[in-house]
Structures are given as structure tokens and as C-alpha cells.
């Protein structure tokens, strides 16, 4: 996957991803209109399909709502790369079908850098800077869940194959 980096700092909580007043919505497309509204008001209008959210430590902390990864899925970002994730956000993102990668080098990535990401190897190419970073690759079964669009879709596939 290849896209432009949208850079955020440490401790980006789920309220920053999708403000609480929009929790009345529950579809990815509707939530996408308000993604990062309080911290990057231009995000929803300027994000492009396959762009990549990059952050520091503890991304997705705070409330354990599924709305945050749903909003990111609706925004059509290809993945989220961070130094670390709040555990429940990490699980929710996988269950929703949003790839998440932990990488210790997110400080080297700047807003607007063009990145190429290989989920199977964890390789991140910063095309803008000519650098390569190593993220922790997702295990095969987790990639299968993400590739199917989330846990529910993955379970449906398993049932239909029986």
C-alpha cells in the first residue's frame, strides 16, 4: 500500500479521532466526515484513499469505542502506523479491518511524506526521504482478518467455506 502520511503526536485518544458528539452515527462513511475534526479540521476534506495515519506512542488511548477505527475505515486510510497503540484500540482496529503497525521510527516520518507499506513484512519505505523502517509485521491470521474487512467478514468467510 502506498499513500501520504498524516502525522500526529503521542497519546492521540479516541475523542481526537472522532469527537464524542458524533457517536450518534455508526457507519464508517458518516463518521469519516468528522474524523480528527478537533485536531486536524482539514483532515476529512483533504485525506485521500490509501493515505496513512502516523503517530507516536499510545495511539487510540481513552474510551474503548469502535467509532474511532470505524471513522478511520470510512476515511479510507490504508493503515495506521504508531510507536505503540492502546490495546483495546489495536484489537478494535483489527476487528473493524483497519491495519495497524507498531514502528519505533515514526519520529523519522513527517507530515506529507510518501510511504509504501508492506503489511506482510512490516517494511515501511519512506519514498520522500529514501529511508526504510521496520515495523512489527502483523501475524498471518491477523492479516487475513484485515484482508477480509474485519472479524465479522472473516467469520462469515470461514462459515461459508464449511
Curated annotation (Swiss-Prot):
Keywords: Amino-acid biosynthesis, Branched-chain amino acid biosynthesis, Leucine biosynthesis, Lyase. CDD domains: IPMI_Swivel. Gene3D superfamilies: Aconitase, domain 4. It holds the Pfam family Aconitase_C. Its EC number is 4.2.1.33. It catalyses: (2R,3S)-3-isopropylmalate = (2S)-2-isopropylmalate. Catalyzes the isomerization between 2-isopropylmalate and 3-isopropylmalate, via the formation of 2-isopropylmaleate. This is 3-isopropylmalate dehydratase small subunit.
Amino acid at each position: 500500500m502506498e499513500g501520504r502520511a498524516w502525522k500526529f503526536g503521542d497519546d492521540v485518544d479516541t475523542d481526537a479521532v472522532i469527537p464524542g458528539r458524533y457517536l450518534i452515527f455508526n457507519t464508517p462513511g458518516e463518521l469519516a466526515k468528522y474524523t480528527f475534526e478537533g485536531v486536524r479540521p482539514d483532515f476529512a476534506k483533504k485525506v485521500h484513499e490509501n493515505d496513512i495515519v502516523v503517530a507516536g506512542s499510545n495511539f487510540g488511548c481513552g474510551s474503548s469505542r469502535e467509532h474511532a477505527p470505524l471513522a478511520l475505515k470510512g476515511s479510507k486510510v490504508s493503515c495506521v502506523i504508531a510507536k505503540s497503540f492502546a490495546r483495546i484500540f489495536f484489537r478494535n482496529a483489527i476487528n473493524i479491518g483497519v491495519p495497524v503497525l507498531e514502528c519505533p521510527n515514526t519520529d523519522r516520518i513527517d507530515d506529507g511524506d510518501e510511504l509504501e507499506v508492506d503489511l506482510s513484512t512490516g517494511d515501511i519505505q519512506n519514498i520522500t526521504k529514501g529511508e526504510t523502517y521496520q515495523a512489527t509485521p502483523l501475524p498471518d491470521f491477523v492479516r487475513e482478518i484485515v484482508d477480509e474487512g474485519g472479524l465479522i467478514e472473516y467469520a462469515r468467510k470461514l462459515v461459508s467455506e464449511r
